[in-house]
Design a protein with these regions (language model features):
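Non-heme Fe(II)/2-oxoglutarate
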Residues: 1-86
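Catalytic core of non-heme Fe(II) oxygenases with the double-stranded beta-helix
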Residues: 102-163, 171-175, 180-195
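Conserved active-site beta-strand element of glycosyltransferases/polysaccharide synthases
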Residues: 99
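A short coil-to-beta-strand element that immediately follows conserved catalytic motifs
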Residues: 87-96
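Acidic/histidine-enriched, glycine/proline-rich intrinsically disordered or flexible terminal extensions
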Residues: 191-205
Length: 205
C-alpha cells in the first residue's frame, strides 16, 4: 500500500504497555524540566531535556523535544517494521516528540529532507486525528486518519501535505520517527540528521 499511495497505517506498531511506558517517561521528563526551570537550575534556553516551542516554531507554547534518547531508541526498534511495510532500506534521521495541549493545531505543511519517510505514533492521551493529502496536491481536502495507542501512520513527509485540526482534548503524547530512503541521493550524508550519532541535540552537527 505504501508504494502505491505513499502512506499506510501500522496498527499496534508497538504494544499499549510499551506506548504507555514511553509516554509516562516523557511526561515525567516534562515535569522535571518544569521544576528545574522554575527553580532556575536550568536556563530557559536549554533544550537538552526538551523545551517549550517559541512563536517561530510549529506549536508555540507546547513541550517538545528533538532527539529524546528513548524516542531515538524506539526509532531503531521500529526500523525493521518500517522497512517491511515500505519495501525500502532506510537510514534513521531523527525523532521529535510532543505533549500536545488543548487548542494546539498543526498547520498544513510538507517536511524537510530528513523527514522523507516519516511516521507519527500515538503514545497516549486523547484521540486526535491527523489528515493528509495522498495526491500530493496542495490545498485539497485530504483524508482523516485515526490512530489509537501504539498505532503509527507511515507517510512520505516531503511529498504529502499533512496537518491536524485544533485539538479539543486535554493532552496527547505523540512522537515523529523520521528516516531516509538509502537509495535517495544525499541520504547517506544525511544519516542521523547529520549528527555524529543518534541521541544528540539538534545543534550538535
Amino acid at each position: 500500500m505504501f508504494k502505491k499511495k505513499k502512506y499506510t497505517v501500522i496498527r499496534q506498531a508497538i504494544s499499549k504497555d510499551l506506548a504507555t511506558f514511553v509516554a509516562n517517561y516523557f511526561v515525567m521528563q516534562k515535569q522535571v524540566y518544569d521544576t528545574c526551570k522554575q527553580a532556575r537550575y536550568i536556563s530557559p534556553f536549554e533544550n537538552i531535556i526538551g523545551h517549550y516551542e517559541g512563536q517561530d516554531e510549529q506549536i508555540p507554547g507546547t513541550y517538545s523535544q528533538y532527539s529524546n534518547i528513548a524516542m531515538e531508541t524506539l526509532m531503531l526498534k521500529c526500523q525493521p517494521k518500517m522497512e517491511e511495510v515500505t519495501g525500502l532500506k532506510l537510514y534513521p534521521a531523527y525523532t521529535y516528540a510532543r505533549i500536545y495541549k488543548k487548542g494546539d493545531e498543526l498547520k498544513r505543511h510538507k517536511d524537510r529532507f530528513s523527514c522523507e519517510i516519516s511516521t507519527t505514533m500515538n503514545l497516549a492521551g486523547d484521540d486526535w486525528p491527523i489528515y493528509l493529502e495522498p495526491s500530493g496536491e496542495v490545498g485539497k481536502k485530504g483524508i482523516k486518519v485515526d490512530l489509537k495507542q501504539g498505532d503509527m501512520l507511515v507517510y512520505s513527509g516531503c511529498e504529502l501535505e499533512h496537518w491536524r485540526n485544533k485539538f479539543r482534548g486535554k493532552e496527547c503524547v505523540q512522537v515523529f520517527l523520521h528516516y531516509n530512503n538509502r537509495k535517495t541521493p544525499g541520504a547517506k550524508d544525511n544519516m542521523f540528521d547529520k549528527r555524529p550519532h543518534l541521541g544528540l541535540p539538534s545543534w550538535f552537527k
